[in-house]
Design a protein with these regions (language model features):
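An N-terminally biased module of ancient metal coordination in phosphate/nucleic-acid-related enzymes
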Residues: 1-78, 129
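Extended substrate/RNA-proximal surfaces in nucleic-acid metabolism proteins
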Residues: 52-134
Length: 134
């Protein structure tokens, strides 16, 4: 049985998680004590702040920096890192081009952060469309 961490902010400098590579490596050392086999790196995506293609480039760069540092520090027992995103709900999400690129690598799973205000019928309709039509 694999132990999977489905949600982490370990990638350095991309969101409110690991501020830099040193904090990312410190987080990884802590994770290693928990015997995690697979880890989803899921930085925040805010449609009002970033375009999907811009976000994907930043995420890939952060992952590359992280992997390089892990190798440079010769860390052992590193979990497999899968790229994903924590997508803040936005109006029109069900019609957003390239939304699939934000899913967990190798899956159709999308980590969706719902609004912190009462949900409207329109919010629920968007999620339903996202599930059924994508």
């Amino acid at each position: 049985m694999a132990v999977i961490d489905f949600h982490s902010h370990i990638l350095p400098g991309i969101d409110d998680g690991a501020r830099n590579i040193d904090s990312a490596l410190a987080m990884l050392e802590q994770i290693q004590t928990q015997q995690i086999d697979i880890m989803a790196a899921t930085p925040h995506f805010y449609a009002a702040k970033d375009r999907i293609d811009t976000f994907l480039k930043k995420r890939e760069t952060a992952r590359d920096v992280f992997i390089h540092a892990v190798r440079e520090h010769e860390m052992n027992a590193v979990p497999q890192i899968l790229l994903g995103s924590e997508v803040a709900f936005f109006d029109g999400i069900s019609r957003a081009k390239e939304i699939e690129a934000l899913t967990l690598e190798g899956t159709r799973l999308l980590l969706l952060e719902m609004p912190f205000v009462p949900w409207t019928d329109q919010n629920l309709l968007e999620v339903e469309r996202l599930i059924k039509e994508r």
